[in-house]
Amino acid sequence: MSFTVDDRVLALAGIAQALQQVRRIADTGHSDAAAVRTAVDSVFRVDASSPQEVFGDRHALKSGLRLLHNYFRSQGQDPILPKLALSVLQLERRFVQDGATVNKVASGIERAQRQANELGDSGHPDVLANLGGLYADTISHLKPRVMVQGNPHYLGQAGVVAEIRALLLAAVRAAVLWRQLGGSYWDFLFGRKAMIEAVDRQLA
C-alpha cells in the first residue's frame, strides 16, 4: 500500500495536537477533553495502518493541522512546541529499536484498553493514570527524554503528570505512524512545499 504526503501530515498533526494538550495542561492544569480522547483512542488502535483508521475523521485533528499551518508559515505562537515534537521524533527512533520496550508497551496498552472498555470512557482519569504509568515505566527511560516545562503548581499534581505522560505516549504513537507512512526528516528540508499544500488541503 502506498501512502501520500497528505497521510503523513495527518500523522504529524496527531503529534502536534497531542503535544499542544501537553503544553496546555502543564501551564493551566486543564486540557481539551475531545483532543485528549482523540489522542488516547489513537493509542488503542495499534493495528491500524492509516491515519484515517488511527484518528478517525480528519476534523478530529483540526487543531493539530492548524498548528502545522502556522508552523510552516513561521506563525507559530509557542516556540517550545516544535522542540517537543523534535524530541518525540527522536525518541520514536529509540523506541522502535528496543524490542523489549515495544513488547511491554503493547501489553500495557492491551490492559489499558480493557480498562477503558469496562469504564466506557477512554478519557477516564483511571485510564489516563494507567497509560501515564505505562509511559513512565517504559518509554520515559529511553533517551532523549522529553522534558515538559510548565507551572510547578500543576506539574506537582499526580493527575496532571499522568495525563501529560498519556499524551506523550499518544505523540510517540503518532510518530511511529508517521515513520510507517514514509515520513523522514528530509521531508522538512526538501518536501516543505508539498507538506504546506497537503495541510491546506486537509483544512479546506
From Swiss-Prot:
Keywords: Cell inner membrane, Cell membrane, Cytoplasm, Membrane. It comes from Stenotrophomonas maltophilia (strain K279a). The keyword Cytoplasm applies. Belongs to the HflD family. The keyword Cell membrane applies. Its main location: cytoplasm. InterPro entries: HflD, HflD-like_sf. This is High frequency lysogenization protein HflD homolog. It is a peripheral membrane protein. GO terms for cellular component: cytoplasm; plasma membrane. Pfam families: DUF489. It is found in: Cytoplasm; Cell inner membrane.
